[in-house]
Amino acid sequence: MALIELDNITFSYAPEETPVLRDFSLSVETGECLALRGDNGAGKTTLLRVLNGLSFPQRGIYRFDGETVDRAYLKNQRRAKIFHRRVGYLFQNPDVMLFNATLREEIAFGPRQLGLPREEIEIRVRDCLALFDLEPLAEKAPYHLSGGQKKQAALAAVLALNPEVLVLDEPLAGLDARTRAKLTALLTELRAGGRTLILATHDDSLCAALEARILILSAPEPEES
């Protein structure tokens, strides 16, 4: 059984609009890396949001590890905590994920929401700061950070949850060459360690480094009335 299964899902943002995803099916195995490609409007970000439980299809079924994920499933606080501990999501725009707390507090926020012990939270925060060489910025608020530092801080916050699955929306977008190389190496290491990666990216070198299975999405045609 695949870890992630989408069975003929259809999603639209409004009833009168053409669906962004129509009768779409997908399966992803544990430890696999899947790269989503396609033009703007093809549904890459929408698909990532469905996989992370931020959007829900109007038709079809999403199964994660054999359990159906829908609004009712995630309304249960215990199940929602388990799901979001297992599936981490990096937005394309890191500002969506960062508040005005210090970077240390930003990274600690997710583990704290999961109810982890204080000592465990401190260890995870320390390790994630070190992973991205962000220790000198630990007491700074995000508005003091560059765009590349914000992206790394947002990914650090995701990794602090220690998720099995990483859902990443354009993880290298807007980064300089040095930071792109650094994050490519990190994601390659995570992939080698058995993490499941699903990402939207236009970066050919990243796909090659991750040995990703590539899925090209295209926007559905409007239905005839």
Q: For the regions a protein language model found, what residue spans apply to each?
A:
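The feature captures the beta-strand-to-loop junction immediately N-terminal to the Walker
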Residues: R37-D39
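Helix-to-loop junction immediately C-terminal to a conserved catalytic motif
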Residues: N52
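Conserved ABC transporter NBD signature motif
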Residues: G60-A72, F83
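Conserved ABC ATPase "signature" region
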Residues: E119-L137
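Conserved ABC ATPase signature
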Residues: A141-L145, Q149
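Catalytic Walker B motif of ABC-type/P-loop ATPase nucleotide-binding domains
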Residues: L166-E170
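H-loop/switch region of ABC-family ATPase nucleotide-binding domains
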Residues: T201-H202
